Amino acid sequence: MKPLLLAAGLVLVALLLYAVVGHGLVNYDTLYALDWGRDLGHGRLPDYAVSVAPTPHPLATLIGLLLTPLSSRSRHGITGDGAAQAAVALAFLSLAVLGWVVFRLGQAWFNTPAGVLAAVIVLTRQPVLDFGARAYVDIPYVALVLGALLVETRRPRAGAPVLGLLAMAGLLRPEAWLFSGAYVVWLAWSPSHRADRGRLLGLVALAASAPLLWLAADLAVTGNPLHSLTGTRSTARVLGRVTGLQHVPATAPRRLGEILREPVLFGAAVGAILSLAWLHRRAWLGAVTGVLSLIAFSILATAGLSILGRYLLLPAAILAIFCGAGAFGWMLVPRGNRRRRRWRLAGAAVAVALVAFIPAQVHRISALRTTLAQQARIQTDLASLVRRGSIGAACQPIAVPNHRPVPLLALWLDVAPRDVISAQERTPTRGSYVTPANRQVADAYILDRRDPVKVVAGVPDGFAPAGGDASWRVFRSCGV
């Protein structure tokens, strides 16, 4: 009965989170996972060499493969919309699971009030809701790593169950490989594991499974086992992203602040300092995980990969748990101990700061809701043009101003992403050209403030108006 109640509770939380933000959209990377999964489902190798392709995450592509029946189904002139809706549903469920795991960890490490506060903090952070509503793989990745921590907290040196969860996480984000390696080294210090070499070798194999599977997937598709590394570095250069270890000291704290905001950082500092000083047996696992996650982040930056805020969601979740400890950890100190009173005063200061910033947090979530509604409306207008046939097989190829709409139109039109032309890569000479109706639509939907080029490509010569709506204009040149 408990699993059923838990499942029902998670679904309820997912629905509540959806109601809070109002909409769900599938981001660029996950749309490619759906396209590539459909390719595999139809017996074709995915095309990882398409311009500005995202990093192929094996587990995300596998889910895309499992969703092939939905991504291949056409309804009212749109193909694959069912797969996109399923991805959004899974994304909100992942958010709910993340909140539950954060609660359980806070409860296990400290107490129930700390766990509740930590979960509330995580599920009310605007960036967390944003990444969740857009179906980024980073949310389930963090949930899996924290799930492994929860298993280890309840069953110290659990071994295979922890490594199994980390292996799944390692097929979404390579940072999990470091956690698996560190965990195996820690297990090897145990006399029981050293005595049973066969078991230890099995655990080493499990820890190595994620990187080996990732390398094998890249090799099978591209012939280059390091494609994800080299391709991601190349894309980071093309998009002008910040990379390099030298940028980590300035960027990481700022990005953590953008995720959590000042009161939570203050509470996390209080909780980390006091719990490590006075409740170190409870706090050490979280502290070690937080440090390892920052080391992993630094390694990625050193390897030339982009320094993105969503790569810091794991340490942000750990800090949220320490913020819960900052507010309520004093309850674990024996009565009559002077430390209890000092911590309680510090906890009261944390609580006051959190409450004082509630209006600002509500405003941020409201702004996110408005942004998602605007982008959903623009995307609905684009879908309407596909349904009406204004964009489709009648006049191909389809071209767009930049790479942003490519994977979505490829999904909807049931074509390869390479068959949708980005005008930033090459100027189309025939077919259909789809462009935003105005600058507001361009800024809201296809332009990114981080991109080096923030200009919408003009309509190619020889293309004439052929339709449109409030958000988009279609131009055609269908001659041979």
Where are these regions (language model features)?
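Multi-pass, polyprenyl lipid-linked donor-dependent membrane glycosyltransferases
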Residues: 28, 55, 87-94, 117-147, ...
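Hydrophobic, aromatic-rich transmembrane alpha-helices
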Residues: 187-188, 257-287, 292-295
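Signature aromatic-anchored transmembrane alpha helix within multi-pass, membrane-resident enzymes
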Residues: 6-9, 164, 204-212, 267-271, ...
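Membrane-proximal lumenal/periplasmic loop motifs of glycosylation machinery
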Residues: 18-28, 43-70, 74-77, 396-399
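Transmembrane alpha-helix segments characteristic
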Residues: 8-13, 118, 122, 208, ...
